[in-house]
Amino acid sequence: MSNIDKLFASVAQKGHVCVGLDTDVTYLPEALAQQFPNIEDGLFAFNKAIIDSTLDVSACYKVQIAYYEAYGMAGLRAYCRTLAYLREKQAVIIADIKRGDIAKTAEMYAKAHFTGEFEADFITLSPYMGLDSLSPYLPYIKDNGKGVFVLIRTSNEGAKDIEYLPTENGMRVYHVVGEKLQTLGKDYLGECGYSAIGGVMGCTHPDEAAEIRQKLDTTFFLIPGYGAQGGKAEDIAKYLRNGNGGVVNSSRGILLAYRKQENGAANFADCARAEAIRMRDDIRKWL
């Protein structure tokens, strides 16, 4: 089974929540930090507890590599151990690496993150050097069932600086990117009807959601922007099709849910689970 079909099936079974393991050392409850003063062990212990508590209610996990690179080799060892544990648990893994280079460099990125210790099911990519920046990843999609999520329209305030610029034919840049990815993705459709070439589609501008979903009908979405950035569950539903076709990321909202509860630090993993369930149910009620 290809990874896009695995992800589709996981959404159908567990809901749309993508737990973002964007873990900083400062997120660790004090008792856990004292128990694991070593950065590698502390980060992994926290991640493992979050994974164990959310595995049955999370469609997938997104691991942002920068949070681990920031701590040097200790952080990268924690990253590797986290990916290995997710593979052991047969969870769908999105490595949030946002690579965007070309030629041999892109070939090395593809090899690094689709094989070996950094192996993930999906990775995130930036398309702004052109479609040839995606080419080195395509053999892994075709031959190994891997997948990518390419930036289309992001949820940050600065997205308007480039993504919203008009092109010569009046379309915005992100419209052009989305259509090019949809066309490219037709050659990599899973049995579920969605392509292994997915897109990152922020949910903070829902007024265009129905049109986007109609045009990009075979593009599976990784959807940021829920919660703190203003995206609502009722908006997210507009980016889905027949209750599937996208996963919704939450990182700090889940990882730091314990900070909103009295004595939550002692039960940080349970608090994360409760928040993931709340988020899942919030989205489902609008489907």
Go through each PLM region and give its residues.
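A C-terminal functional module that forms or caps the active site or interfaces directly
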Residues: 203-249, 253-257
